[in-house]
Amino acid sequence: MGKVLAAALVGIAAALAAERLLAFRNRLNATREVDPVALPNCYLIKGIETGSEDIDILPNGLAFISSGLKYPGLKSFAPDKPGEIFLMDLNEKKPKASELRISRGFDVGSFNPHGISTYIDKDDTVYLFVVNHPHQKSTVELFKFMEDDNSLVHLKTIRHDLLTSVNDVVAVGPDSFYATNDHYFYDFILMFLEMYLGLTWSNVVYYSPKEVKEVAAGFYSANGINISPDKKYIYIADILDHNVHVMEKHADWNLTHVKTLQLDTLADNLSVDPDTGDIWTGCHPNGMKLFYDDPDNPPASEVLRIQNILAEQPTVTRVYAENGSVLQGTSVATVYDGKLLIGTVFHRALYCEL
């Protein structure tokens, strides 16, 4: 009887493990291959070789690009090199990327930038919020952009017990923001178990100097976050659930769910066209390939444009897609005046004219 019970328990455990493995592979779109969609007027941006994980463009056409992310389980082409913030002026005929100098007093050696967001104050001061992972921790660094000498002045480092595994931020004030925690754990082994078991413990946090609170929860992995042009709605990409959530923002900064748009790909960062309200997102057609270091089968790239997301049937257009021969692991796409920038987690960046 004891042997029968033991065999039954082993069988149940094996069945559960197999079911979790299948669900894990489905969340990563492990079998999907991408059909190419080409854009004719594109070139790789010189100088960006180790990632362009997030991009934010000011209304005047200046684009900030975070580069050099080292993230648990993912490839890095320069694991010992500190991260950087690049600047591009999209008003130029052939825009180039240049590294922004960071003021003294900031630990550049441990700089590991992830998601970014800009905020323009009433006096036209430009603030840059940068998710940072020094020594595999999570902070949000607040900088002031000095356009006259293309530099960043570090103002402060923001830490909090609710900011545990920050992926992206969207600024809503000169020192306040919404942030996504893409996992409950930050330790790589526990993070992997969280993903494998399909735990929905990821969340969104509102931060200000006066108040810090959880405002949304129940995500597999809350990733990119952004705000509508009218400031009424917050958009959140759940990368492992293949969808984008629309949340209504209230006067007390709480969020309530409005709708969810389901996709067939892993949407990473979200960018919003301030003129049209369209959402642009860099996506991973097959997330499993991100974790493999296979030069013969690299992670592919995909860019989606979402129009009228509040409508009953939004329009979703695949603007760009390719198998990784040009760009590996697209994480962001954003537009300005007919120009498209496409960034990646750890690879190159692409400039296109639409």
From Swiss-Prot:
Q: Which cysteines are cross-linked by disulfides?
A: C42-C352
Q: Which Gene Ontology terms of cellular component type are present?
A: extracellular region; membrane
User: What modifications does the entry list under PTM / processing?
Assistant: Glycosylated. The signal sequence is not cleaved.
Catalytic activity from the UniProt record: a phenyl acetate + H2O = a phenol + acetate + H(+); An aryl dialkyl phosphate + H2O = dialkyl phosphate + an aryl alcohol
Q: What is its EC number?
A: 3.1.1.2, 3.1.8.1
Tell me where it resides. Membrane
| Membrane topology reported for the UniProt record | Peripheral membrane protein
Under the heading InterPro entries, the entry gives: 6-blade_b-propeller_TolB-like (IPR011042), Arylesterase (IPR002640), Paraoxonase2 (IPR008364), Serum_paraoxonase/arylesterase (IPR051288)
Residue sites binding Ca(2+) 1 per the record = E53, N167, N223, D268, N269
Provide the active-site residues from the annotation. Answer: H114 (proton acceptor)
- Write the gene name: PON2
- The organism of origin for this protein: Gallus gallus
Q: Which domain of life is it from?
A: Eukaryota
**What are the required cofactors?**
Ca(2+)
Q: Which residues are glycosylated?
A: N29, N254, N269, N323
Q: Which GO terms describe its biological process?
A: response to toxic substance
According to its UniProt record, where is this protein mainly located? membrane
* Molecular function via GO: aryldialkylphosphatase activity; arylesterase activity; metal ion binding
Keyword annotations from UniProtKB, A to Z: Calcium, Disulfide bond, Glycoprotein, Hydrolase, Membrane, Metal-binding, Signal
Q: Does the keyword Manganese apply?
A: no
What does it do? The absence of paraoxonase activity in turkey and chicken blood and in turkey liver indicates that PON2, if expressed, does not hydrolyze paraoxon.
Q: Does the keyword field hold Phosphoprotein?
A: no
Extract the PANTHER family matched here. Answer: PARAOXONASE, PARAOXONASE-RELATED
Q: What is this protein called?
A: Serum paraoxonase/arylesterase 2
